[in-house]
Structures are given as C-alpha cells and as structure tokens.
Regions:
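Short loop/turn segments that connect beta-strands within beta-propeller blades
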Residues: 90-94, 136-139, 187-190, 232-236, ...
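Extracytoplasmic beta-rich repeat domains
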Residues: 54-68, 83, 98-117, 145-167, ...
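Loop/turn-rich, solvent-exposed surfaces of beta-rich toroidal or solenoidal domains
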Residues: 270, 292-359
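Blade-level signature of beta-propeller repeat domains, shared across WD40, Kelch, NHL, RCC1
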Residues: 270, 376-406
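Bacterial Sec-dependent N-terminal signal peptides
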Residues: 1-24
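Short loop/turn segments immediately following the C-termini of beta-strands
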Residues: 30-33, 79-81, 128, 177-178, ...
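Blade/loop signatures of beta-propeller domains
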Residues: 23-52, 142
C-alpha cells in the first residue's frame, strides 16, 4: 500500500474511532440514567416561595416526559389532539418548531411518556401507540420511523408504550413486547433490524432500560410483564431473567448497576431487589429482596451505602441499607420522583411540592420546599437539572428555575 494511501487510511480510521468514543448521549434521568446530575455551586437552600422562575412555556400539550437540554436547545414531547409532537425551544424558552411523531396515548392518563434520547445530531423517541422515530435535532426532519405494533406485533398495554429509548454505538433498542419480537435492536441511522430477541414472550412493562458495560460484554436490562431481562447487546441473546412476585405488570423504574450489583425497585412486583451479576454477565444471584419498598415510577437514588426512594403504598419516603436490604428510616413526604445534584436530593411529589433534602447516611432532612402551582394535570414528570437551572415539566407547561448559587 502506498505511504500516502496508508496515511490517509490511518487518519480516517483514527477519526472514526475518536468520533465513536466521543459519542454524546443526552437522555432520561441524566447521562447514565441514574437520576444523578453532575452539577456544582447550586443553592443550598431556597427563599420562601422557591427559587426565581426564569421563564415558562405553556404550549407543550399533555405529557409526563422530561425535557432534554443540549448546549443550544431544549427538546420535549407532548400530545396535542391525539398526536405526539416533538417540541424544540431555545434556552430562553422561546418556541422554535414542533414536528409530528405519531399517534399518542389518549386513554388512561393521556399524554406523552417517552423522554427523547439525543445522540450527537439525532433524536430518538417513542409515541404511546408504538411509533419509534429518529429525527434530525436541528430541524426535526424525520430520518426513519417504525411501528412496534404493526412491524413487530407489539400488544397494546394498559398505559401505552412508555420507554425512553436506549442507544449503544450504532444501535437503538426498543421493546415491542411481542411474542416473537420482544426486544429489538435497530440500526440507529437507518431503522433496519440488527437483531430480535424473543425474551420470555411477555408484554412490555413501561420500563426505560439500562445499559451495563462489562469487559466481556454489554447487557441491555429491562422489564417485561413478569421478569427483569438481561440481553447481550451484540447478538440479542437472552442471558438471564429474574421473575417478579405477584401478577403486576407495571415496572417503570430504570435499574441501576454499580460495583457488580444490579438494584431495582418495582411497586407492582418484588419490591426492592439486589442481584449479584457474574463477572462475565451471564448469571445473576439474588442477594436480598424487600417487598415493603414499593416505588412504582418515581425512580430511586443510591448514594454510598443507602437508597432513597418513595413508597407508593404508604406515601412516605424510605432510606434503605444496600448491604442488608433493610429499611432504616422514613420521612413524611408524598410519593413522587427523586434526583441528586450537588450533594442534595431533589424530591418532587405528586401533590406538586418540590423540595430539597440533605442526605446524611441513614437519615435525610428537608432543607427547603415550594409548591408548583403552574401547569396542568398530574405531577408525574421527572425534573431535570442542567447548568444551574431546574427544569420542571407539569403537563402543558415547562418551568425553568434559577438554582445557581450567586
């Protein structure tokens, strides 16, 4: 091979490798889906009435999905007249454009569910009746779309397709929940099928999945109706499953992987569970299970040796020891979502109260709180913290609060 040609090949190959390794993913509950936002110099307490409201946008349509913020734009989807739209705003909350995604869920709790996933210059999102779409982030132009019901025989469930799509390399994953097409990997640039996993042949269960990266393999982790599934991202092989107690089918919370262990919480199954994952990722061993810890869709935060999460049955918040699985304390605060930023827990409950709490080992103490009075319908959406701004979606409204310490 001539030296010039060889040199050009090396430069192009190196550029491709660097581009692949620098892939920027903005998604549900932060960059790694743990609910932890890497922020600093945030307010340690709020004035009475809450932090300053920077702006409000009131035209989103119905929905419970969270916004995703880039360096220049904000993306969030909502339902208007039965259709799911992707909305684009600038960082001041000014409307830029909206584009149609597909038919949105309008039965039980009408509105968008799926938080968009943004990888470099492309957006991936799901609509409630099964559309999966790839859009150009700059203009909203559709690159491709598929229908999980028509194309993969996904059954219609009680609350609509809800997952926030997961991307790995050149693949985007979706869970139609069909008997023959349970989980599907698509080429994220073309929408063509990479592989199909039959799983256990069970209906999907509203979970936004997690990606576990090991030396031996990467594993796609999600829930079907009655089990947690671990699937090899390379070929779609089902590696293992963990059966749920009872007959519930709502397993919304994204699992967590840390230091060789998988943690998950479901209010409609086994409760809180810790699993040991083998080094090669092919087997799991149950460490403990606590059915009293029953968060349904508010997420949870693991900080050091403790998990902080809401109880959906008792409308309180639990602190759980991750070594033993025992509940070591609780506080009175209505059920809702939880995030962590700059060493403080951000709790947003279903009555509209937003609070910051200081976690101290097996305890947590409320520092400040205020009521979200703007917006419409249920307080379900998970807040987002980005560059010192707290973004709260409440139905048709997106609110931006200044929480940066001056």
């Amino acid at each position: 091979m001539p030296i010039k040609v060889l040199f050009c090949f090396v430069v192009l190959y190196t550029t491709w490798i660097l581009k692949g390794n620098s892939q920027q993913v903005l998604q549900w509950r932060g960059t790694d889906r743990t609910g932890v936002f890497q922020e600093s110099n945030l307010l340690k307490s709020w004035p009475e009435g809450g932090p300053a409201l920077l702006w409000e946008f009131d035209g989103l349509g119905n929905g419970y999905s969270s916004p995703v913020i880039t360096s220049t734009m904000i993306y969030v989807n909502g339902e208007v007249d039965t259709i799911s739209y992707m909305f684009a705003l600038d960082l001041s909350g000014k409307f830029l454009w909206k584009v149609e995604i597909g038919k949105e869920w309008t039965l039980s709790y009408p509105g968008s569910r799926s938080t968009p996933t943004i990888v470099d210059d492309l957006i991936y999102v799901t609509a409630g009746w099964g559309t999966v779409a790839c859009l150009e982030a700059k203009t909203g132009k559709e690159r491709w779309s598929i229908d999980m019901v028509k194309d993969f025989h996904g059954p219609i469930n009680r609350f609509g397709f809800s997952e926030s799509l997961l991307v790995e390399g050149d693949k985007v994953f979706c869970a139609p929940g069909g008997i023959d097409s349970n989980v599907v990997a698509l080429d994220r640039f073309t929408g063509r099928i990479k592989w199909i996993c039959k799983g256990l042949g069970e209906m999907t269960s509203y979970c936004s999945p997690q990606l576990i990266k090991l030396q031996a393999r990467n594993i796609f982790v999600t829930f079907s109706k009655n089990a947690l599934l671990g699937i090899d991202t390379k070929d779609g092989a089902l590696l293992w499953s963990h059966k749920q107690d009872g007959n519930g089918d709502v397993h919304v919370n994204t699992p967590l992987f840390e230091d060789g262990y998988i943690y998950y919480i479901t209010g409609d199954g086994s409760g809180s569970v810790k699993l040991k994952l083998s080094n090669d990722g092919t087997t799991i061993t149950e460490v403990w299970k606590n059915s009293a810890c029953d968060n349904t869709m508010g997420g949870f935060i693991k900080l050091d040796n403790y998990i902080y999460t809401a109880s959906y049955g008792k409308r309180i918040w639990y602190i759980q020891d991750v070594t033993t699985g025992k509940l070591v304390d609780s506080i009175k605060f209505d059920k809702g979502t939880t995030n962590l930023a700059d060493s403080l827990l951000y709790l947003y409950n279903e009555k509209g109260q937003m609070g910051i709490f200081k976690p101290v080992g097996p305890k947590m103490k409320m520092v400040s709180s205020f009521k979200i009075t703007r917006g419409t319908k249920a307080h379900f959406a998970h807040p987002v913290i980005c560059n010192g701004i707290l973004y709260v979606r409440h139905g048709k409204s997106l609110l931006a609060y200044d929480i940066k310490e001056k």
